[in-house]
Amino acid sequence: MGISRRPKADKNASAADSAPGGKPNIQKAQFDTTKKKEVGVSDLTLISKVSNEAINENLKKRFDNREIYTYIGHVLVSVNPFRDLGIYTDAVLESYKGKNRLEMPPHVFAVAESAYYNMNAYKDNQCVIISGESGAGKTEAAKRIMQYIANVSGGSNSSIQETKEMVLATNPLLESFGNAKTLRNNNSSRFGKYLQLQFNAQGEPVGADITNYLLEKTRVVTQIKDERNFHIFYQFTKGASQAYRESYGIQQPSQYLYTSKAGCFDVDGIDDLAEYQDTLQAMKVIGLSQAEQDEIFRMLAAILWTGNIQFREGDDGYATVVDQSVVDFLAYLLDVDAAHVIQAITIRILTPRNGEVIESPANVPQAMATRDALAKAIYNNLFDWIVERVNKSLTARAETSNSIGILDIYGFEIFEQNSFEQLCINYVNEKLQQIFIQLTLKTEQEEYAREQIKWTPIKYFDNKIVCDLIEAIRPPGVFSAMKDATKTAHADPAACDRTFMQAISGMSNPHLTPRQGNFIIKHYAGDVSYTVEGITDKNKDQLLKGLLNLFGQSRNHFIHELFPHQVDQDNRKQPPSAGDKIKASANDLVTTLMKATPSYIRTIKPNENKSPTEYNEKNVLHQVKYLGLQENVRIRRAGFAYRQTFDKFVERFYLLSPKTSYAGDYIWTGDSKTGAMQILKDTNIPVEEYQMGVTKAFIKAPETLFALEHMRDRYWHNMAARIQRVWRAFLQIRIEAATRIQRMFRKKREGKEFLELREKGHQILQGRKERRRYSLLGSRRFMGDYLGIAATTGPGSKIRGSINLPASEVTLFSCRGEILETKFGRSSKLSPRIFIMTRTKFYIVSQLLVNKQVQIAVEKAIPLGAIKFVSISTCRDDWFSLGVGSPQEADPLLTCVFKTELFTHMQAAMPGGGFNLKIGDSIEYAKKPNKMQLIKVVKDSQQAQDHYKSATIHTQAGEPPNSRSKPLPKGKPVAAKPFTSGRLIKPGGPGGRPSRLTNGNRPTPKPVPTPAPAAARPVPAVNPVAASIPVHTRNTSVQSTQSTRAVPPPPPPAPPAPPPAPVSKEPQYRVLYEFAGQSANEFSLKQGEIVTVLQKETNGWWLTKNVRGQGWAPTAYLEEVTPPPPPPVATRPAPPPAPGPPKMNGTNGAAIRSKPTPPAPPAKRPAAGRKPAPPPAPRDSGMSISSNGSGNNSGRSTPTPSLAGGLAEALRARQSAMQGNAKREDEDDW
């Protein structure tokens, strides 16, 4: 068996990744209950002791445990189980598809898979040589190989399927005509068959060819006790149709001499009736017409009736026919005259050397011999015709690329009486053994020596001497001696036998031992004694001219097809003998097999009783020895599993090295040997696993080759996956690009509608109303439904449901605003409302809290047609009134920040275009029914927001009335979002170019400016008043401040000395290169900035931080900074003594006036990560003031009036600044 596929990679069987420093994600081990425990060793190369006995013991263990297959490297050893083990089901067959030898248990399916895969992969012809003795299971193995190949060879068209069916149909057909029950095997092949399956370049079967060898035609006329004739005779006589029985006179097998002589009619395990139907079905599948089938069974009937012709000795001593009716019926079947049949059987035509033709009457033995010769000739030629007819149907229907041959030939035979047939059979087995020796033992060792490979020679027996003993011409071998004896005394068979025996006795060969009446040949399988009597006559293998004349006189066209050659009465040249034919066939077979890559199946018969439980160790040991399994094990353990020329090796595996291939092309410029070495190097094959010869690369273990094959298969898979991935990415780019274009188009189109609506707002105001800055922003769009009333979900949908707004009403505008409520006895005030406008009505919706629950209800629903006018002012305020003029209700006075947008939608929805907008200095509305009132609008710069009081609205000045909206601002530049993700498509869009706005694939955050060191920071001038004011903890009124005792202000303190630079307790590092973080926990760095390392990991990442934040950064980007030595502590001059209050005794004072100078600050600052001390607690009796220094003693002092005045001034300045900011913010408001 050659090399098969590597296993497919398991997608789930990948190493578990773990986080840095985390616990590895190791799966818990599970006990596999499905795996079958191995008995013995499945490969005999693994046995501890190499001996015939150890091999036999291992085979016995496996046989007892229903394991019949064992490997010797790539050779399969099969032990016949004599029972069905259920190991040839479709499920088992599927499990071997695409698997190599090491993945699955030994099986004949693995041999078939290997042969089929190697044929497709290496484009080499393959052959499977099945050897072993009769009954060891060769035919069954051949059928299983055909079953597997037919299943996996693919092809869905009708022609290929028909070819498969015909190939499988040849098994039952040829078994019926070529197999028989023997003492050693119930289904013994009595012929040899070499089936050559032909495949096209795609590995699909397109045809087949069958060559048959050594049909045992003597079985037609004679069998030993308890054996049977060929199966077809019993199938036909038991299962023939009534038409055949009437036309051909078919009776039960017991009625015919040829089927009843051995006394065995039935066989255990064989159903002749069922197999007869299988034979008929096989004939139909192969394409035999009904007429052809009729002629086949007519010839079978003729053979059966020929055997029933009996003779007796006449008065003249010659043979006469006992029953003329039998001859008459045979003449009817052969379509000849009965007289011609009697003449052909009872009259012998002799042709001496002088050319005179002599007709000699035959005696009874001679007549019976001629009768049997007639039957054998018909059956032999009928079998050849069937094989030729099958080949005609299996002719290749397309161009043939490669083939797989399956050799099924009966095995080595040793009987008590061995004659010419056994000599031919054993000779062919010797030739097959010679092939095995040459290919696995001799040729392998010779190749190692020729290629200069380091090798330990193994001793083995070369059976060439035995083959030469049988087939040699000079000196003459056994076949040549037979032919010479026939030439010397061709007319007398007994004289020929004696001449042949004399020649055998004169031979000198260690493997030949002459005896009295027989001779012994020491075959590789054992010593066999051959009987000389009749052996030369069988070697003649020529049909009497009388029988040939009989066939020539037949009026049946089919008989002329069986015997196409006309009889040449003048030809005296000796025809080829049977020995010549078998030698030519055997040599042709050897030539065919040597042109293919062989796979071997060595079959072993465990016992002679066909028992499924018996294991005869003695018999099996004998088979182990003559099959040479021990030598095969030794060579396999010491040899190389694979060898190939450098050119073919590189051609096969150059894809595996980046130095020999690029994009599938061969780019290596050196010689093929260095290329092969480069491939093995790049694939990490250990040097111990291969050797380089003179012309070939040798790989020791099959696992290595499996790995190379698997990597090659994965290469194509990966390339296909890469192309698919790029193609999918390309399609995704097109889809995304189209989506982006559509999105931008819709955005521009929809935005254009909103912008056009905004321009209509300018037209409605007629350039007479001042505008707010927000209303003129370029990004301002009139969206309309701000509350989402038209949405199906969200708060807007709940409002719609609460007011029972019909679904048919389209919401044009919605927002929140306020309404001016007038209550009796109270001033008017603003109340929040919800404004909703549809195509027909304007709704004012209220929200009330009732029993702690919000209730939403329609307060007013004003039809748009009822609105007579809308009144607004010329100022920038948001107030407007809806002039309804209802006699029962007042007009609503509303405020809404989106008033202009509301007017725009209202004008478009107003029926008849009757929208009347009044713009004046005041707002007009009916405060009470039919009672109009004017609301004045005045400009007040002190008002940040619109303020209503006493029928007057105070508002700030706005933008000029003729102001127009600013242009739409450009969007903020953002990084281009990649269309796809993955290694093959670069980020940044279809072009794959990174965006100018990105660093990597995300924007780099702006660096926060790092504060300058304290030592280099300039000290600002200190305000005398502000310098004495710490954090304000309480606002002190001016009156209370003025009531305090006056204290002169202290002199300004001297500027403090620059503090030393803080020394970090954590290591500082400088950033060498700019780094953009790729995830949330990665920290983006700017080149040159200083960071602090908080945590170091061994995986190349450190946890860093600075003023901008913290995160993980690569170690290689950082360089440690050596901190400088701390500067000397500088002392500042003492301030002059402060005049004024006497020394106070107490501990809570802010300063001690009697102390001449404050102590110097500490040399080291607190750590950067430490939080500052909390401010002092507020005091009830005044403001707490801290001096510039700190001391152990403290005092309490009352602020002076000048100090209070300075504090008040500072507070006013601060309040003014805050108001200015608030004013600016209010201006930005709606």
UniProtKB/Swiss-Prot annotation:
Q: Residue spans with biased composition (Polar residues)?
A: 1033-1045
User: Which stretches of sequence are listed as region Disordered?
Assistant: 1-32, 945-1018, 1033-1065, 1116-1230
All copies of the SH3 domain together span 1064-1123
For the ligand (ATP), the binding residues are 132-139
The processes (GO biological process) annotated in the record are: actin cortical patch assembly; actin cortical patch localization; actin filament organization; endocytosis; mitotic cytokinesis
Q: Bias regions of kind Low complexity — which residues?
A: 1179-1214
Q: Where is the TH1 domain?
A: 771-961
Disulfide-bonded cysteine pairs: these are none
Subcellular localization is given as: Cytoplasm, Cytoskeleton, Actin patch
Q: Which domain of life is it from?
A: Eukaryota
A GO molecular-function term, please?
microfilament motor activity
Question: Which keywords does the record carry?
Answer: Actin-binding, ATP-binding, Cytoplasm, Cytoskeleton, Hydrolase, Motor protein, Myosin, Nucleotide-binding, Repeat, SH3 domain
Protein transport in keyword set: no
Chief location bin: cytoplasm
For bias type Pro residues, the affected ranges are: 1047-1062, 1122-1142
Q: Which GO terms describe its cellular component?
A: actin cortical patch; actin cytoskeleton; cell cortex of cell tip; cell tip; cytoplasm; mating projection tip; medial cortex; myosin I complex
Tell me which Gene3D superfamilies the record gives: 1.10.10.820, 1.20.5.4820, 1.20.58.530, Kinesin motor domain, Myosin VI head, motor domain, U50 subdomain, SH3 Domains
Residues forming the Myosin motor domain are 39-713
Q: Where is the IQ domain?
A: 717-737, 738-763
- Family of this protein: Belongs to the TRAFAC class myosin-kinesin ATPase superfamily. Myosin family.
Q: What is known of its domains?
A: The myosin motor domain displays actin-stimulated ATPase activity and generates a mechanochemical force. The tail domain participates in molecular interactions that specify the role of the motor domain. It is composed of several tail homology (TH) domains, namely a putative phospholipid-binding myosin tail domain (also named TH1), an Ala- and Pro-rich domain (TH2), followed by an SH3 domain and a C-terminal acidic domain (TH3).
Q: What is this protein called?
A: Myosin-1
Q: Which organism is it from?
A: Sclerotinia sclerotiorum (strain ATCC 18683 / 1980 / Ss-1)
The taxonomic lineage of its organism, from the top, reads: Eukaryota, Fungi, Dikarya, Ascomycota, Pezizomycotina
